[in-house]
Amino acid sequence: MATVIDTPTLEGRDLVDPALFKRLTDFCAAEYGLEACMAERIMDEGLAFLDTMGRSGEPLSPSRQVDPAWHTFMLHSAEYTEWCMQRYGRYMHHAPNSRYRDRSAMVDVTSRIRALGYDVDDSLWGVAAECNEPACCGDGPCC
């Protein structure tokens, strides 16, 4: 008889204090005009993304839908700086358009997030539709 071992999945929200997660989601909802449940999903994915990037030491790009989580956390600068320094020993800078957000990039990022044990909300990791010429996002309207 085979034994099935349930491995619990990690959640990004568990990387910060519950009170901070609430403040971040409330801000994200208000700043981006989102319903609370969507802001929670975005912040959860964003924190998992940041942990993946921090642990890898490599620059990664979030999806267009997850990017507001990074912006939200960075705007809470004291908490963000302390979190980065305590967890990774460095501040993680945000360089917009540091990497194209095409399908292959998002598959790479979500694969890395999953490899660390996080459950990925695939609906938030689509391809960005807004492109900055001359870059092409792969399947956006500018291509």
Task: Kindly give the residue locations of the regions a language model identified.
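Intrinsically disordered, low-complexity, repeat-rich regions
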Residues: 1-143
